[in-house]
Amino acid sequence: AGNSGTLGRLVLGLLVHSKKKIKLKGDKSLSRRDFLRVIKPLEKFGAKFNSNYGKLPIKIQGTNYSKPIRYFENKGSAQCKSSVMFAALNTSGETIIKAKKSRDHSELLFKYLKLPIKIMKKNKYDIIKVKGKHDVPALNYKIPSDISSAAFFIVLTALTKNSILKIRNVNINPSRIGVFYILKLMGIRISKLNIKNYKGEKVADLIIKSTNKIKSINCPIKFNSSAIDEFLLIFLVAAKAKGVSYFKNLSELNQKESPRLKWSSKILNKIGIKNIVTENSIKIYGNPKLKINKKIVIKHFLKDHRVFMTSVIAALSFGGEWQIFDKDSINTSFPSFLKKIDYLGAKID
């Protein structure tokens, strides 16, 4: 699975009915991450899992006699929810999932493929019912541009004076674009053009324009889930804002490839930005005149691909000479990232 937590967790749901014993492995970064919260509900289907204390590598023995389950997902993990949905698709009977609001790509795909799914939307939770067994039709699918990848260049544009960026054909699923709303509240100008539906998902072209005055923010927690992968970048924008920005209820960031709140604080400290970090919040004292004229070294970050790429964006935005280790950390999620950075004129050794 490389260092892809999404691939690792989703494939476990698909392997619940495997007739062969399967061993799932990942790189060092992924092997440090917790898989127990997806293993536990999948065991209820009847499959057997032998793991390294809830971590990779994991041995899976599928079941021929799976039974539908009831599952309460209260962390807002789309990966866990989707893994259970995939397992339910090949299980006779109706599986019922009560899930905290999270990304809904799997639900939209199920609907587009006309698979047997019912969704009742509540205030904070969705009730999802999946009926199995059901064959999945084949389809050709061209994946739209990923907002999490686009966000690096959106933030670089936001932090670069007199800049305009256009990105074509970006997935603007409402459960993914919290970063738009947060950046707009901070004064960044983002507009959507040519909005259309593509196989259940909304896509659009994006226009991003920088601003001379970035505003501080008391970030509404309603955007946390839909911006969870972009917060490291958002914190860079807060570093350049006028005033104090506050972000809370972000303990989920510490369940990623590295404890990202801690690493955000470290990066901010290195660039001279005062901040106060707790287990689930961070307060950032912005400096609109921020400019770096020293050497900065970023290493020992558990090969978290987003820490690497965020550090590159910080270097381009704030100046200075940066030495950033472990560039191989981006090989799974964004292998062409440095080529795109090089195209923009950055000097990379």
Feature map (PLM): residue ranges:
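Structural preference for solvent-exposed beta-strand-turn elements
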Residues: A1-D349
